[in-house]
């Protein structure tokens, strides 16, 4: 593929890792961020020590403080900013764009208040004549592993498969591989909701429960993620793929996951405000829990794990009691899709 100019909006751990993948593939990569010291560090020292202590970035990766400079003549834009600021950044991008670009995002969350998926936000804020159909880049991936070129397989989802294949082409190489998918709703809801289940899985570990309990919360978590996703229009088969069960496994079982670590601390009795302060990073699963709970209540979708996590975080319920209460819920069939 011809060399592309790509703006990566957000110099966090995942944005930095994806920037390196694109750079490895010979593309011109421009990272944009709003913390001047971090931008200077990337340009002068070729490091981003806030997230990676021992990683040296390629000197061809450039960072920008001015969004207009990062967007100048680019072929594609990759949003990797926190969910809560995606709309704000998209508005800024829309004001500056003077040509049509491919628009991608690699964030995982649902917007508080509106309950909207991130692709919907980007569609609303960036005029259709200035962008492609949105492409969602999502799947089982720890930035800490991708940045050291460990093998990673994820999904590129879009309503337009030609655009998804373009994104597949700019990213894929010997250690990083993308598969295309047309189920944007499924891929986005899977990526957002698995963070809630990861909080629960971490909490179980923090409370001292074993592998049986962790396997249970992951598999039943997948069931309720699928339940809500299908209600919203997703294909249930998507949840058996990389962006579904794959992402849930990697997030719900690893200390690399900030959502798992947050749950672990909650399970050990730490206060949420202390956890967020100590981690110093966005814990998307916390805000997503509230959004998912509200959607489930509105649509009448049964989500007991999400409800238990919600009550613990937002209503002050004891997390151990909330989780144990699920054991007395009405007995059900495992295969709710079986019509027999």
From Swiss-Prot:
Binding site for NADPH: 13-14, 108, 143, 258, 282, 284
Catalytic activity of the protein: sn-glycerol 3-phosphate + NAD(+) = dihydroxyacetone phosphate + NADH + H(+); sn-glycerol 3-phosphate + NADP(+) = dihydroxyacetone phosphate + NADPH + H(+)
Protein name: Glycerol-3-phosphate dehydrogenase [NAD(P)+]
Keywords from the named record: Cytoplasm, Lipid biosynthesis, Lipid metabolism, NAD, NADP, Nucleotide-binding, Oxidoreductase, Phospholipid biosynthesis, Phospholipid metabolism
Family membership: Belongs to the NAD-dependent glycerol-3-phosphate dehydrogenase family.
Residues noted as binding sn-glycerol 3-phosphate in the record, renumbered to the chain: 108, 139, 141, 194, 247, 257-259
Top-level taxonomy: Bacteria, Bacillati, Bacillota, Bacilli, Lactobacillales
UniProt pathway: Membrane lipid metabolism; glycerophospholipid metabolism
Molecular function terms from GO: glycerol-3-phosphate dehydrogenase [NAD(P)+] activity; NAD binding
General function of this protein: Catalyzes the reduction of the glycolytic intermediate dihydroxyacetone phosphate (DHAP) to sn-glycerol 3-phosphate (G3P), the key precursor for phospholipid synthesis.
GO biological process, one term: glycerophospholipid metabolic process
Subcellular location: Cytoplasm
């Amino acid at each position: 593929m011809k060399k592309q100019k790509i703006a990566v909006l957000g110099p966090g751990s995942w944005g930095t890792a994806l920037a390196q993948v694109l750079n490895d593939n010979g593309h011109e990569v421009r990272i944009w961020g709003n913390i001047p010291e971090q931008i200077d560090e990337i340009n002068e020292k070729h490091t981003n020590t806030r997230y990676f202590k021992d990683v040296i970035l390629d000197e061809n990766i450039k960072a920008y403080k001015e969004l207009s400079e990062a967007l100048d003549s680019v072929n594609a834009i990759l949003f990797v900013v926190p969910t809560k600021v995606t709309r704000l950044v998209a508005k800024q991008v829309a004001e500056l764009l003077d040509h049509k670009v491919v628009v991608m995002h690699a964030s995982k969350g649902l917007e508080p208040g509106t309950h909207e998926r991130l692709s919907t936000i980007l569609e609303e804020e960036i005029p259709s004549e200035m962008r492609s159909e949105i492409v969602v880049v999502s799947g089982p991936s720890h930035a800490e592993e991708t940045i050291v070129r460990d093998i990673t397989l994820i999904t590129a989802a879009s309503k337009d498969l030609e655009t998804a294949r373009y994104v597949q082409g700019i990213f894929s190489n010997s250690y990083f591989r993308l598969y295309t998918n047309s189920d944007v709703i499924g891929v986005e809801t899977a990526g957002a909701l698995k963070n809630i289940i990861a909080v629960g899985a971490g909490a179980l570990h923090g409370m001292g429960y074993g592998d049986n309990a962790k396997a249970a919360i992951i598999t039943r978590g997948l069931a309720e993620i699928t339940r809500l996703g299908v209600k919203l229009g997703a294909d249930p088969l998507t949840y058996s793929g990389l962006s579904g069960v794959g992402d849930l496994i990697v997030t719900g079982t690893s200390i690399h996951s900030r959502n798992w670590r947050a749950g672990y601390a909650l399970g050990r009795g730490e206060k949420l405000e202390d956890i967020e302060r100590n981690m110093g990073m966005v814990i998307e699963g916390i805000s997503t829990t509230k959004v998912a709970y509200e959607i489930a209540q509105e649509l009448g979708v049964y989500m007991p794990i999400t409800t238990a996590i919600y009550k613990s975080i937002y209503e002050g319920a004891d997390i151990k009691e909330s989780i144990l209460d699920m054991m007395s819920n009405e007995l059900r069939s495992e295969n709710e899709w079986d019509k027999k």
